[in-house]
């Protein structure tokens, strides 16, 4: 399926290099998207290598199915990467996966297609679901949630300073007419935001908060990180690319905790086995960012942060 919307894979070479792909290894691409990372991983795999892709988006699944038809080493499943642990168990891969890649956030085709309802730049139905067949849409949430809950979503997930004021404006307007279109909501948020940031649409943070809430992105990330560590073999690598501070903070703290060993997180008066002092992972290098060349070619890569960890035990 060709949706007509292109996607430029961020940190393509860097992410696959960080995975240290073995020809006979088994790898998971937790965010298949349009398959940029997956195709390069397959190029590094030999005949006995395997790659399993995950995505919730039906258009991504269609692209993945076409790739699977071309290459028998690849399989795609329509699931969140938060479920990769159970999928690995079903396939007998628990503790046997050589590397896992998570490229977080929303893809360019999702943002650029007005019918998906992610963007305030192009008018479309107010949806925002990665999988439009499941869960509550942004319009349904906005229509029924109390002002306090809407404000919490804007503030907690969008880091919006004027969350309460903007949520009240949304509730007042919905009493007159429900929100069905992205441009309609964006206009109300724009008027309610008293302090516009230079170069940024005043609805940006609120839209981010809504999208994260509708798709349970942070909850999925926390579950996916835990599942990834259980699924990896010793020596296997986890590569995560995040696109905003909330995601990156979760990834950074998760990796730091495991790099210190569990004993660092336990009360000092408990009898603790020596093994608890041993780190579970090794963090490879510092956070990596897109190069100047990449950010000029793809401005959306400016906010990308990549972190890499290797499982030790």
Swiss-Prot record:
It catalyses: cytidine(1402) in 16S rRNA + S-adenosyl-L-methionine = N(4)-methylcytidine(1402) in 16S rRNA + S-adenosyl-L-homocysteine + H(+). GO terms for molecular function: rRNA (cytosine-N4-)-methyltransferase activity. The keyword Disulfide bond does not apply. S-adenosyl-L-methionine binds at residues 35-37, 55, 81, 103, 110. Keywords: Cytoplasm, Methyltransferase, rRNA processing, S-adenosyl-L-methionine, Transferase. GO terms for biological process: rRNA base methylation. GO terms for cellular component: cytoplasm. It is an enzyme of class 2 (transferase). Specifically methylates the N4 position of cytidine in position 1402 (C1402) of 16S rRNA. Belongs to the methyltransferase superfamily. RsmH family. NCBIfam families: 16S rRNA (cytosine(1402)-N(4))-methyltransferase RsmH. This is Ribosomal RNA small subunit methyltransferase H. The lineage of its organism: Bacteria, Pseudomonadati, Pseudomonadota, Gammaproteobacteria, Pseudomonadales. The gene is rsmH.
